[in-house]
Amino acid sequence: MANTYMKPGDQTFDELIGDIRHGVYLKTFMEWNIDDKRFNERYVGHEAYLIENGELTSYVRNPVLELTTPKLYSSVDAVSKEMEFDAGTCGKGDPMQGAPVYEGGPSVRLRNIRLGGGA
Amino acid sequence: MQTTVQSGESLLRDLPRQIVQRGAKAGAGDIVGGVEVEKRRMVRFSNNVVTVVQTWDITSPIIYLGFGTRSIASRLSDTSTAAVDESIQQMLPAVNALPETVESHIPRGPFQYKNVPGLFDSKVPRLEAELMDMVESAINASLAEGAKRVSGVLTSYHTRKSLYTSTGVDASTELTMVEVSLRSFAEDDASGQGVSVSTSLKDFDPEGAGRESGSFAKQSLHPGQGHEGKHNVVFGPSIFANLLNTVAFSASAYAIDAGYSFFADKLGQKVGSEQVTLVDDRLRPAGPGAIPFDDEGHPSQTNNLVAKGTFETVSHDSRTAAKLKTRSTGNATWFSDIGQIVPIPTCLVLDEGDRSREDLFEEAGDGLYITNNWYTRFQNYRTGDFSTIPRDAMFLIRNGKLGPPVKGLRVSDNMIHILQSTRAVSRGRKWMRWWEVDIPTYLGHVLVDRVGITRSTG
């Protein structure tokens, strides 16, 4: 899938976080992986912020989002209208081939997700 | 501009010399001219039948230009002298734009290279229809063990490589390798992997790989959900080879310099338990990844990366060695991911212990046996925090014995912790190399205490 993204919604980013009393904004991520059934996935925030009463406040270190794919998508309750994309490469093989991809989309809000880390 | 296109023996002999002449004319002080000629034959198969057969003839000239405090390298796919000239003209402004570093020079030859036996088998370049027979034997062996579907890839490699430098190096070598990696399914959630890798046909065992893969698939039927926590884990050769590849990369001066190493500032320190001795043995007889010289013409060495738990050797090429005021370890390697020659270990050997796999289960008591993985990703390269996803066969260990299969778990830990918590290493090693194991690695099973295991929260 070289050019797949989530359909944008009708809220601004500020509206997306505006009614969050206590949450986390994962802007970018570092560690990530997914199993071969695409069922279990994990993302560890790289640049991430605490959301308090609708405002981004302090930096959050290494928040871990580890959940199933159905849980992820069923927890989405709002999607922003702004979209951002980057060029990327997806490894395919065997033998190794780099497939150019366009990756990104809108900001997405998930409700009642547990963030954790470590065993 | 006159152009010459060469092929075969004359290409291997003459093109490196022509690169050096042209580099000198362009004003470079240190020049490496190299050419690699590879024939690769691949047979892919899925759902028990062959789906793709493909042959590649890949010829890759390599140009390295050194200007004292700056250097640049390029790998081409065009063997004409016009392409070499054009590439050098493109490299000159690029190298001038680089920041200056410590002055360094490529190794001064000539060198006497060690003869490493078993790196070439004349039967491998002649393999054609036999590759299909090998695939068939692997599939049949897997099905006989109880698999229903078998997929994978079998590839043979024949590589000829020559190198000529402005400092008196004149080297050439011929290498072969044949490898198979297959995955068998007994049901959708019951799978197993099998691998065989060798430089020669006599040690290549596709049927054995098929048996292993099919057997794991059958044993994995009806897996239960595993539990998160700290578990004693017996790692199979495939997953532990993947983890050791990250150890080898961390031992590279390039990774340390770039901030991608969990071994930074740890030279001479304990980074693992007494059980961990990892060698980059580029002179190992019949070792996939072994080669008598590196991409600067420096003779290969046997380097103890980690010796009884102590980080003993940083892998260097001439540039990184000059920067850290030490000597090259003979690891200069063209690294296609970044398009540079950097120091990289290429032939990993983990010291063996004296226990069997079953002894490790007994020592583990209660825990997990994980055979394979994919997607090892670092949260923090400097600290070594990472996670990786077990795939294919995974089992509980109960009361020191192999228990029922489980699924749905993730290894979420730290590489230094993994090395320091290594309690035992088995005897009975095998070579591993596949999609997730880029650097060939020779190892057995490994028992690690209290490994972090996580699972999805919902």
State what each model feature region is.
Chain A
Residues 1-119:
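N-terminal small-residue-enriched
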